[in-house]
Amino acid sequence: MKWKMKKCPKDNTYTFKDICPVCGSKTMIPHPSRFSPEDKYVKYRIELKKGVKLNC
C-alpha cells in the first residue's frame, strides 16, 4: 500500500510532497509499520533501536 500523506520531522507539517514546502527538508511517512506476530525481523529492529548487539 502506498501512503500519500507525509510529515516533515522538523516543523511537523503535513504535505503530499517528498520535500517540505515550508523548510525544504525531506518528509517521512507518519504511519507506523504494520504489526505482525509472525514477524521474522523484530529482533533486528530492536537491536537497531537500542544499539545493542543481540546474541542470536
UniProtKB/Swiss-Prot annotation:
Listed GO CC annotations: ribonucleoprotein complex
UniProt GO MF annotations: snoRNA binding
Keyword rRNA processing listed: yes
A Pfam family of this chain: Nop10p
Gene3D superfamilies in the cross-refs: H/ACA ribonucleoprotein complex, subunit Nop10 (2.20.28.40)
Disulfide bonds: none
Keywords attached to this entry: Ribonucleoprotein, Ribosome biogenesis, rRNA processing
One GO BP annotation of this record: pseudouridine synthesis
Assigned protein family: Belongs to the NOP10 family.
Biological role: Involved in ribosome biogenesis; more specifically in 18S rRNA pseudouridylation and in cleavage of pre-rRNA.
PANTHER family: H_ACA RIBONUCLEOPROTEIN COMPLEX SUBUNIT 3 (PTHR13305:SF0), RIBOSOME BIOGENESIS PROTEIN NOP10 (PTHR13305)
Name of this chain's protein: Ribosome biogenesis protein Nop10
Organism: Saccharolobus islandicus (strain L.S.2.15 / Lassen #1)
Gene: nop10
